[in-house]
Amino acid sequence: MTKSQVNTWGPAISSPAELTVIIVGLGIAGLTAAIECHRKGYTVIGLEKKPDANQLGDIIGLSGNSMRILAEWNNGSLAHLIDDDITCDVTALELFDAEGHQRLAMPYNANDPNQGYLFRRTGLLTKLCHYASQLGIDLRFGVNVDGYWETDSSAGVYANNEKITGDCVVAADGFHSKARAIITGETPAPEDIGVVAYRSIFDADAIADVPEAQWILKKAQTADIWHTYYAKDTMVAIGTAARGRYVHWGCAGALEDRSESWMQPAAPYPVLKCLESWPVGGQLAAAIARTPPGKCFQQALRAIPPLKRWVSTGGRMIVIGDAAHSFLPYAGQGGNQAIEDAAVLGICLELAGTPNVPLALRVVEKLRHGRVSLIQKGSVEAGDCFLDAAWESDDTAERPTAFTHQAWVYAHNCVEHAYKQFHAAAEAVINGREYTPTNVPTDGKFRQQDGKCM
């Protein structure tokens, strides 16, 4: 699809080199936005307060709706992003009860868009950062952004006593975004859902001398495993990555030890205490108890209601990713929707042209807000299913599953959708009309099962 085919609305597209995009936050949303904007020919300045691209976390899944975007990079090859060291090579997601009985084994294929690849989060971010650097994108780490500003013709930030100017600012600074309130004027109150999450990933050498933990390495060097154990109000996922080089585990439940919503270092003792009452607990504890110091993190899960808007009053600043729509982890879509945001951002800037940056950002909001808000709400619904293990229920919808299968989420092509819907959304912005999203189910409901889009 060429520019001449898609840019049928408004003035001709200006030279891409005339547009400078400032991106604050270089996590998954920020790095993919930087790459997508660079691919359109724009000048990108990426700012990150941390000294490098490393982030806390264990495993992240990217399904077909985001992988199709990454697959367009590097001449259509994913080889630069996918290797054995950063992926989980699993052939099945195995589900167990607290007795240790296997209840379900769901075949897993990374090439299935409803499933996708499982990555070590830090490994994926390192790959994204390396690729962006190879492209020559200006990435600046260790930079503290102190303020945001915009005029009718430009926007920028104050960082490390420097005023940085561009045509627009994209804030991808995460769940605890400082930019959110400045850009949107909103400070939504997080809802405590009564769940604490623990997570860890560490070198498998830590369990090498533990006979009771060797079950987790049964496929090491040839494949990985992924086991999820469900009990009332608590679930534990445990497995390997990089064909047995790493052990990862996560626990979410109504545990006694409560923390702030910030992810922070912790010891796994509350998890081990919980497992004492599980018949299978000793098997799991054999590995979890060997978590090295500094490798376990916890946080209280909090649900944030959807924002009313993502774009600043002047139209030259926007929030994306977790800064715009933080998800609970149960929907498995946080990283995926951040990547969709990034791709749609690049397309809207391309189609609107340099003189129309405010229009471009407002169209991004029109195209993305309804979709991610519904998934955001749905992540709470998904959490209820994960933590209410009704193995004996006659209603299959009440039994635990490893993932949901909504085609409108996993099979969505946000690139094709953005090109097709840009003009309708742009006209809605210009004329002050409501825009009806076409990338959500017709009845506007999330559902654990599938729903058809308009």
Swiss-Prot record:
Q: Which UniProt keywords apply?
A: Alkaloid metabolism, FAD, Flavoprotein, Glycoprotein, Membrane, Monooxygenase, Oxidoreductase, Transmembrane, Transmembrane helix
Q: What is its cofactor?
A: FAD
Residues binding FAD are E48, G61, R121, D322, G335
Tell me, what is one Gene Ontology molecular-function annotation carried by this entry? FAD binding
Q: Which residues carry out catalysis? A: R199, Y229
Pathway in which this enzyme or protein is active = Alkaloid biosynthesis
Provide the catalytic activity annotation.
notoamide E + NADPH + O2 + H(+) = notoamide C + NADP(+) + H2O; notoamide E + NADPH + O2 + H(+) = notoamide D + NADP(+) + H2O
Q: Which Gene3D superfamilies match?
A: 3.30.9.30, FAD/NAD(P)-binding domain
- GO process annotations (BP): alkaloid metabolic process
In the record, the note on similarity to other proteins reads:
Belongs to the paxM FAD-dependent monooxygenase family.
Return the PANTHER family for the record: MONOOXYGENASE, MONOOXYGENASE, PUTATIVE (AFU_ORTHOLOGUE AFUA_6G12060)-RELATED
Main function: FAD-dependent monooxygenase; part of the gene cluster that mediates the biosynthesis of notoamide, a fungal indole alkaloid that belongs to a family of natural products containing a characteristic bicyclo[2.2.2]diazaoctane core. The first step of notoamide biosynthesis involves coupling of L-proline and L-tryptophan by the bimodular NRPS notE, to produce cyclo-L-tryptophan-L-proline called brevianamide F.
Q: What is this protein called?
A: Notoamide E oxidase notB
Q: From what organism does this protein derive?
A: Aspergillus sp. (strain MF297-2)
